[in-house]
A protein has these predicted regions:
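An edge-strand/N-cap motif at the start of beta-rich repeat modules
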Residues: 1-28, 48
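Short loop/turn segments immediately following the C-termini of beta-strands
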Residues: 8-10, 44, 53, 96, ...
Length: 189
């Protein structure tokens, strides 16, 4: 299988092949992308999912641009981070407008608010579906990185010192390491 990097670049989504020496990026042929913030991929069905802050929606399409659908448009203000649970077939997202973390089935049904208290500016979200955890950043007045079980229970703070605007997360499942990018300190840790 081809290794690719998916990129949400405001008004378009791109895929960059990591199998070619020049890392050429290809713009995905999907209409009406106004302000894409985050993107994730479901390796089971082959859909990409993204948040669009301008149209206040969560959408999906196949990598070739076909099958584009809008999944969530109600009670959504500033959808930000997005993460696919490829095991249980769920979709998680953060909303910096409603200050919530929510989940729905991958087809947009069975929506549920998981966390709505003590969130200031929730941004990035990543999952470890095998172990049953979610991790997210909050870059509000007291910036922090937190985790909880995928059902929102057993919430705890992992990092709350030396952070400015933690807004990117990556999880290395093999090495069990969490990496974050900070837009204020310009660091990746």
């Amino acid at each position: 299988a081809e290794e690719v990097l998916l990129l949400a670049r405001r008004t378009d989504l791109r895929r960059i092949s990591l199998d070619t020496p020049d890392f050429t990026d290809i713009i995905l042929q999907i209409d009406n992308i106004r302000h894409a913030i985050a993107i994730d991929y479901d390796p089971v069905e082959g859909y990409i999912y993204w948040t669009d802050d301008d149209v206040r929606a969560i959408r999906r399409a196949y990598l070739d641009g076909s099958g584009a659908q809008t999944l969530v448009t109600t009670e959504i203000n500033h959808p930000d981070g997005i993460a696919v649970d490829w095991v249980a077939r769920n979709l998680y997202w953060t909303d910096t407008g409603t200050d919530r973390i929510e989940v729905t089935r991958l087809n947009g049904t069975s929506r549920k608010i998981l966390i709505s208290e003590n969130l200031d500016e929730p941004r990035a979200i990543v999952l470890n579906p095998v172990m049953g955890y979610m991790y997210w950043t909050d870059w509000g007045e007291s910036p922090k990185i937190e985790c909880a079980y995928l059902d929102g229970s057993e919430r705890r703070v992992l990092v709350n010192t030396s952070l400015g605007w933690p807004n990117g997360l990556a999880l290395d499942l093999e090495k069990d390491k969490l990496y974050w990018g900070d837009a204020k300190t310009d660091k990746i840790e």
